[in-house]
Amino acid sequence: MLLSRNLRALAAIHLWIVYLLLEDLLGTCAEGDNQRLVASAPYQDIEITLEKPRVQAVAEPHTLRYDLMALSLEVPGLPQFLTLRYFDDEPFLPYKKNSSITDSQEPRIKDHLRAETWGRETDDLQEEEEQLKGMLAEITAQNGQNTDLHILQATFGCELQRNGSTRGFWKLGYDGQNFLTFDQKTLTWTVDGPSTQKNKTFWKTRAPRADLVKTFLDDICPAQLQRYLASLRNGLLNTGFPKVIVTFRNYPVGRITLTCRAFRLYTRVATLTWLQYRKPVQQKTFGSETILPSGDGTYQAWVSIRVLPGQESQFSCNLKHGNHNINEPAATEAPVYGARREQPPTSGVGSRVGKSLWSAMTTALVVISWTLSQKLMGPLLWFCSGGFCSFLQCW
């Protein structure tokens, strides 16, 4: 017997919430060119009080992104409205409807922003909720769908590129499908996928006003991004200097593996170099695609090299990171072969222990989600496209 559409939609919402929670903990599941579903936009006029940031080259690109979701009906155990904010793909400041808690997952950002700035950021979440709910209510009413469960999603933000310029992005999605994308060059909305002229007109007339979207993408978002970036720079006082640690491990094949690990990296660019008699023999430069998050807003990296027993004292590891140039010798005392020097514990999901725990949690949640989908909806096929994960039902 086929189950009702509402029951199927409810199961889909559960799976989508699981994805959001996993992404909140582990980061995005796929890299993309900011091709995420995006939510509603402000309808009322916005008074611009932010000064447009100066164009200044940066060592690496930075991104500020907002992911919003609204449900057309209340579902027990699920938030009717959810907002996630990401700085360089790391979540902070989650907001859920029916919850009085709006706290930053990146405390250094909150600590170094002025109180009035942080309050304004929090108040904006309430406005975004009302705007998104209003848009969803209008869409479902026009289509005669106000008795069914539907989802309206939004993704928007901006990227600071290496040459100092910025570009914005804004997308809207309905029931897991992209339907509107804002073109920042032409200042127009385009309907994704094939559609009749009537449907195109319907969606475009309900999209956020182009002038307000332009103001947000050109002025407000870049200014917020610059503030967050400055906040993290100031946060270096809390994290201290980068830390370099060298460990070794003896293998029975007559070689020793030296591993150089760098912690407390405050940007996603670093270079680790193995030196023998102070001359480089192996070098690796880490960027946004290869460096690892530590889970506390900083990053870490490592590089290994194999040497003959007795050569440890010839080697040292060099870290170049921002204005820091740190050298760490490979051996300050005679190693005990066959043993492994104890490594200091690391905090956050970037550590090995953290990764194993989160891996176990991921497996459990996937099994639960799969079981739920089998019982309520039949098999589901998950897919990741352009950084946004969704699913297809296999009938």
From Swiss-Prot:
N-glycosylated. Expressed in stomach, intestine, uterus, skeletal muscle and heart. Gene3D superfamilies: Immunoglobulins (2.60.40.10), MHC class I-like antigen recognition-like (3.30.500.10). A lipid is attached at S369 (GPI-anchor amidated serine). Belongs to the MHC class I family. Its main location: membrane. It is a lipid-anchor; GPI-anchor. GO terms for cellular component: external side of plasma membrane. Residues 370-395 form a propeptide. Keywords: Cell membrane, Disulfide bond, Glycoprotein, GPI-anchor, Lipoprotein, Membrane, Signal. It is found in: Cell membrane. Disulfide bonds join C158-C221, C260-C317. This is MHC class I-like protein MILL1. Residues 338-368 are annotated as: Connecting peptide. Residues 57-148 are annotated as: Alpha-1. Residues 1-32 form the signal peptide. Residues 332-352 are annotated as: Disordered. It comes from the Eukaryota. Residues 242-333 form the Ig-like C1-type domain. Heterodimer with B2M. Residues 241-337 are annotated as: Alpha-3. PROSITE patterns: IG_LIKE. Glycans are attached at N98, N163, N199. Residues 149-240 are annotated as: Alpha-2.
